[in-house]
Amino acid sequence: MKNVRMAGVAFFLLMMQLVCLSVKADNKADYLKLAQKVRQEVWDNTPVDFKKRAVPEKFKKESAVILSYYKELSTDYHRKATTELFISGRLTRQIDCEDMERMLIQINDKKALKDYSEFSFLTKSKKWQGGYHHTTNTILGIRVLKKDGTVQVVDFDDYVDVKEGKKGKELSQKIAVPGLEIGDCIDVFSLDQIDTQEQQLDPFVFFLRQSEPVLYSRIHCVLDQSLATVYRSMNGAPEFKQTTDKDKNAVLDLTMDQPVDAEPSVWYNATVQSPYIMMFITPTKTKTVIVEKAMRQKGVRANPDVAPILQDDWKLMKTYVSKNGYSPIGLSGKYTRVFKALKNADLSAEEKADRIFSFEYICAGTSQASFNVVPNYLRKLGVELEMGITTPLGALPVDQLINYNSTTWFFRLKGTNLYYFPGTYPKVASEIPYIYQGRKAYMQDSEE
């Protein structure tokens, strides 16, 4: 009887494996079919400027030249019936987004030939927050424009799966570009099809300077005005020209028809030195994150006032720090002993702060959420401190914020130069992580 049961289990597992393999095969077949359709649509809608080939004399010795650059972004916001409808009777808010980047690049030497002879990409990624997904399908398209005028379209049916990362758990795809030669042009695009439920989209960054010289650039956005879209132009970047289409979408356009030099290869930070535009697109209501007043205005806003955004962030800080602070009810015995011992100990404010910080850091980790309990614990112990808001390297400066989700909260012991930040391993108390060193900050010395 036991052998019969084991045989039944083995048969069941075998059938499950076959089903999984079939699903994976279907998924890949569906992806390839969709990708082929998208590529054909992109090739059939080639902008006029992608037919230009003239290169100014000053760029003829460059390794590669971007003859034309095109960026397109679109959003559509709607409600969708999901399993949530049967559980709570509510529809799920969803943003459908397409983000495409396309370049026509002239190959001038062996270095460029090597750089553009192979591409890596990820066909699909998925993450979850509060039971709602954020899915991205990426479609890559490549064709080679030969010197004699012929066009060779790269076949993606045989892309190679490559296992990378720790224990080979990260799967990416690679494709070679056969037949590419010096003097050819390569027309390449990457299209992300994104759908996200009850969440804001990841920020979009439009850099107006690239690693190669660019002769012509255009950015085109068609944005659903039911969403809250804000952007800021940095380092001399211009604003978009905004119009409205027949469907009442906001249409943003930016054209740069003058050549732009390549970024320097060394000692260069694009977020500090290159002109760029940072954009956040957020639903005005969502079930997974708090959307404060400054982020609830529908439509598109350019270079908004920072003050309301900071006020919202101070409000959020007070809420989170207070809620996650010290309360003797529900604390584990280990926590209770630590805080009672520190309350009765004859220690300086710095010593108490170092011990609380280190204890929480070791027990709970490096996240902002874990760090938030530290200042409130210290206040309960009678330690005076000042809370602060800043942003890390790579984010917009705190005095040019457009979204409070990019901020970091920290504190300083009052009357000292000792600062405490969330951070990464390894780290000691009162050490400022390099990503915050030299960054602008706002301080507040009151719990209110």
Feature map (PLM): residue ranges:
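Bacterial Sec-dependent N-terminal signal peptides
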Residues: 1-29
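Structural motif marking the loop-to-transmembrane transition
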Residues: 3-4, 349, 411
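Generic secretory/membrane-interface signal
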Residues: 11, 20, 286, 306-307
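Beta-strand-rich, non-transmembrane domain signature
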Residues: 26-304, 379-381, 385-448
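Secondary-structure boundary elements
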Residues: 297-373
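Buried hydrophobic packing segments
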Residues: 374-378
